[in-house]
Amino acid sequence: MEGVMMKNQEKYAVAVRKPDHEIEVKVSEYTGIIRNKKIRNMPILRGVFSFIESLVLGMQTLTYYASFFEDEEVDEKKKEPMTEEERRRQEQKEKKQENAMMGGTVVLSIVLAVAVFMMLPYYLSTLFQKVITSQWVIALLEGVIRLVIFIGYVALISLMKDIRRVYMYHGAEHKCINCIEHGMDLTVDNVRKSSRFHKRCGTSFLLIVMLVSILFFMFIRVDSPILRVVLRLLLIPVIAGVSYEFIRLAGRSDNAVVNLLSKPGLWLQGLTTKEPDDEMIEVGIASVEAVFDWKPYVEEIRREMK
């Protein structure tokens, strides 16, 4: 996980700091799960598509990162005598295994996330129904429990050395974006002094999802516990879509109210981003430059500032 992924429209780049300390950059095309632009750009729906695509791209990126640390094992296999046909079959088999593993990991990740961050808070909140009669209060309590579990999880894994490095690369990603969005050349020195906090962040998105879910779940008024669970699951895509629209608005607006509502997400980034070192910043710069010609963009911002 020694790298940074940057996406610009239908192109994305993955820059990795290899074990030999060289930076390797891979640029790929990603058209998305829905190719019809009218459907892809529909409010709410675009947030659902973006969320799913982020999961898929995330798994592809992690698989690519891991490949650099499996090179020695692969090299040993290549030393074994094989015919060209046997090698081709072996590569096809490994590709199928990789795709199956990636698909299984995505499904498992979604199931675990729903179980821990959606279902567990719901069932814990039902324990208070004997002493709290208001369904509004129970729904609010469920949301508070969900936030505590989520923030606790983020804080706990930040204690792990490897995850801390992931958070440092996350910081490098934000600092690179902030650097060019503030009209500065994309250099190590400029990136270093840029902020590691950014409104359009996946961390902020997840927190907004938690907060928006409180509002939606307050209006679920059915007696059947099973039906309440089913309705929560069905509302997840809608909640993700609404949350995406807010994050999109926050990234484009300097409105005082929007800035205030964005604060919790920025505070949470205090946990999910750390100050990167210069080598990490170099990786971030390589990733940006692979998919985005930042110089004309920076020039335009400078003209607007005059």
Please name every model-derived segment.
Residues 1-78, 84:
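Divalent-cation
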Residues 2, 6, 77-81, 132, ...:
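Polar-ligand-bearing catalytic/cofactor-coordination segments
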Residues 11, 42-64, 142-167, 240-252:
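Hydrophobic alpha-helical membrane-embedded segments
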Residues 35-41, 86-102, 188-194:
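Cytosolic juxtamembrane amphipathic/interface segments immediately preceding
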Residues 64-68, 109-134, 209-231, 237-240, ...:
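Juxtamembrane "helix exit" motif at the C-terminal ends of alpha-helical transmembrane segments
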Residues 70-97, 102, 115-135:
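Hydrophobic transmembrane alpha-helix segments characteristic of membrane transport
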Residues 98, 102, 106, 138-146, ...:
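Residue-level signature of transmembrane alpha-helical entry/exit and packing/kink sites
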Residues 99-117, 198-209:
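Select subsegments of transmembrane alpha-helices in polytopic membrane proteins
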